[in-house]
Amino acid sequence: MKKIILTIGCPGSGKSTWAREFIAKNPGFYNINRDDYRQSIMAHEERDEYKYTKKKEGIVTGMQFDTAKSILYGGDSVKGVIISDTNLNPERRLAWETFAKEYGWKVEHKVFDVPWTELVKRNSKRGTKAVPIDVLRSMYKSMREYLGLPVYNGTPGKPKAVIFDVDGTLAKMNGRGPYDLEKCDTDVINPMVVELSKMYALMGYQIVVVSGRESGTKEDPTKYYRMTRKWVEDIAGVPLVMQCQREQGDTRKDDVVKEEIFWKHIAPHFDVKLAIDDRTQVVEMWRRIGVECWQVASGDF
């Protein structure tokens, strides 16, 4: 049975590279790509010159299906076609499924699951093929949905809440390094962020503090948790209702730790409306899982 292979993945995830290599090793397969048609029908030199319209996209879709049909009817030497697009739109995948069913062909998915940080790095090096970061973020969200990973759409019926980070957000380090937690009680407040937390509390929001700080030492696994809580409540005066922190000995990246904390301890109990953070990797994590996030300062570290 002849195949229609749909690549599934964000821009920069390696779909086109894989298609080229696959076709080189598997005679009888052919590649059909929307971007190629977009560039061709408008006679553009570069792909980023293309301006999306419903009419032009309809033409591209028609060309894709007509080409696929012509190729697949091309005799026994033809084994299949690769549709090397993102294919993150469920309606487009359904259209190919329907098309294949009508003619008795088989649809397969080739999935390219690339971490967000790697996608951003690759996107920055793609030149005219790069997509705006908000577009990449939207596509990554669609990829999560395709993979069955959770995307946050609120928790109706639970208390509304705002999440605040500590280091670089509520607190500014005062003569210590980020891992010198023995001195974390000497931090100074970040006044406008602390005021914001109090304003939201007065408006009826629950304040949840989430920190990437390790919670303690081997000898005292909650030492830094207690020091942090005391600073947040007594020094900053933040009216928090919950504090979550990295477990002692957990060396994973901040965005991984905080996302896990969110799904396990926060999402089931609060209707989270906003997160306030400073570190870019964490800010992007909040946004890509569906939580609005305000970034306090430039934090690309």
UniProtKB/Swiss-Prot annotation:
Pfam families in the cross-refs: AAA_33, HAD_PNKP
Family matches, as Gene3D superfamilies: HAD superfamily/HAD-like, P-loop containing nucleotide triphosphate hydrolases
SUPFAM superfamilies referenced in this protein's UniProt entry, alphabetically: HAD-like (SSF56784), P-loop containing nucleoside triphosphate hydrolases (SSF52540)
Activity's dependence on pH: Optimum pH is 6.
UniProt entry keywords in alphabetical sequence: ATP-binding, DNA damage, DNA repair, Evasion of bacteria-mediated translation shutoff by virus, Host-virus interaction, Hydrolase, Kinase, Nucleotide-binding, Transferase
The protein's Enzyme Commission number: 2.7.1.78, 3.1.3.34
Keyword Mitochondrion in record: no
GO BP term, pick one: DNA repair
Superkingdom per UniProt: Viruses
Reactions accelerated catalytically: a 5'-end dephospho-2'-deoxyribonucleoside-DNA + ATP = a 5'-end 5'-phospho-2'-deoxyribonucleoside-DNA + ADP + H(+); a 2'-deoxyribonucleoside 3'-phosphate + H2O = a 2'-deoxyribonucleoside + phosphate
Molecular function GO terms recorded: ATP binding; ATP-dependent polydeoxyribonucleotide 5'-hydroxyl-kinase activity; deoxynucleotide 3'-phosphatase activity
Cofactor: Mg(2+)
Subunit structure: Homotetramer.
General function of this protein: Acts as a 5'-hydroxyl kinase, a 3'-phosphatase and a 2',3'-cyclic phosphodiesterase. Catalyzes the transfer of the terminal phosphate of ATP to the 5'-hydroxyl termini of ribo- and deoxyribonucleotides. In the presence of ADP the enzyme also catalyzes an exchange reaction. In the exchange reaction, an excess ADP causes the enzyme to transfer the 5' terminal phosphate from phosphorylated DNA to ADP. Involved in countering a host defense mechanism which activates T4-induced anticodon nuclease and shuts off viral translation.
Protein name as it appears in the record: Polynucleotide kinase
Gene source species: Enterobacteria phage T4 (Bacteriophage T4)
Gene name as annotated: pseT
